[in-house]
């Protein structure tokens, strides 16, 4: 049977590692008494469009907690330069078909709506020429636009397909007229978008990605998706169908989630 006739399977992978510079041991920190990684895995389990899901980790303590809770775990190398490299190892270990789709669910975003996971997967299915898909949302305030921790994205529309042109920590696009005036409007451009860290990949892209060295812009911006663009790949992008709640990067973020009632947290 040709690959064109074979069914496309969708796999959700949750990369989880302990080495966080801002919040050590992040996947194992608890929200309402349960390790964060388990909240994320339970959310992924609600995504009924996927054929399967697993947690990818290089840490035995994370693996044990997830295995004890009944989740599939894949042990991966601790030497990966990026999360995408880790996904590629999982795809190789699992023997997934080149035309299959992998959805990357961040291990520090326990409130991700399954709707967005399905949206990013569908986006990739609908754009046969793209090797990745991701989402974005409008930036409404100037401080967010200027913040380096917020990744911005500019895109183009070609043949009714919207694709990313560039991702940056810098404030892009730049409003030339505002920059050249003495009075800054303190308003982001109307077409300023924040990139959301949800990705869908074709396994064929993951197979190629690991053989490509880190690229100059990827290293400069510390954004792994730039490796795809610098090697000529297309990344489909769309405005998120709903808002993506903030993930957990700091102790304040963790405290905010623990301050929510358990019912509100579970029903989010």
From Swiss-Prot:
Residue ranges of the TM segments: none
Pathway participation: Nucleotide-sugar biosynthesis; CMP-3-deoxy-D-manno-octulosonate biosynthesis; CMP-3-deoxy-D-manno-octulosonate from 3-deoxy-D-manno-octulosonate and CTP: step 1/1; Bacterial outer membrane biogenesis; lipopolysaccharide biosynthesis
Cellular component, GO, one term: cytosol
Keywords of this entry: Cytoplasm, Lipopolysaccharide biosynthesis, Nucleotidyltransferase, Transferase
Location(s) in or outside the cell: Cytoplasm
GO molecular function terms listed in the Swiss-Prot or TrEMBL record: 3-deoxy-manno-octulosonate cytidylyltransferase activity
Catalytic activity: 3-deoxy-alpha-D-manno-oct-2-ulosonate + CTP = CMP-3-deoxy-beta-D-manno-octulosonate + diphosphate
Top-level enzyme category: transferase
E.C. number: 2.7.7.38
Chief site of localization: cytoplasm
Keyword Transferase appears in the UniProt entry: yes
Task performed by this protein: Activates KDO (a required 8-carbon sugar) for incorporation into bacterial lipopolysaccharide in Gram-negative bacteria.
HAMAP family: KdsB
Family statement: Belongs to the KdsB family.
Protein name (database record): 3-deoxy-manno-octulosonate cytidylyltransferase
Organism per entry: Psychrobacter cryohalolentis (strain ATCC BAA-1226 / DSM 17306 / VKM B-2378 / K5)
Classification lineage: Bacteria, Pseudomonadati, Pseudomonadota, Gammaproteobacteria, Moraxellales
Gene: kdsB
């Amino acid at each position: 049977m040709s690959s064109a006739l074979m069914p496309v399977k969708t796999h959700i992978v949750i990369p989880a590692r302990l080495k966080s510079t801002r919040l050590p041991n992040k996947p194992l920190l608890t929200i309402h008494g349960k390790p964060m990684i388990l909240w994320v895995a339970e959310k992924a389990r609600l995504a009924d469009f996927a054929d399967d899901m697993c947690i990818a980790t290089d840490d035995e303590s994370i693996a044990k907690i997830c295995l004890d809770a009944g989740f599939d775990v894949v042990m991966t190398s601790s030497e990966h330069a990026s999360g995408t490299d880790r996904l590629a190892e999982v795809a190789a270990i699992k023997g997934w078909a080149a035309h299959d789709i992998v959805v990357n669910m961040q291990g520090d975003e326990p409130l991700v709506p399954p709707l967005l996971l399905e949206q990013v997967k569908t986006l990739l299915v609908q754009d046969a020429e793209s090797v990745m898909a991701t989402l974005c949302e409008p930036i409404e305030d100037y401080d967010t636009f200027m913040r380096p921790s917020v990744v911005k994205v500019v895109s183009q529309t070609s043949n009714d397909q919207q694709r990313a042109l560039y991702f940056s920590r810098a404030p892009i696009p730049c409003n030339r007229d505002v920059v050249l005036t003495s009075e800054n409007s303190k308003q982001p451009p109307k077409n300023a978008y924040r990139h959301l860290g949800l990705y869908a990949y074709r396994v064929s892209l993951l197979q190629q990605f690991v053989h490509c060295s880190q690229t100059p812009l990827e290293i400069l911006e510390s954004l792994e998706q730039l490796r795809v663009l610098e090697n000529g790949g297309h990344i489909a992008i769309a405005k998120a169908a709903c808002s993506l709640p903030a993930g957990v990067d700091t102790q304040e973020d963790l405290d905010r989630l623990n301050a929510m009632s358990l019912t509100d947290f579970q029903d989010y």
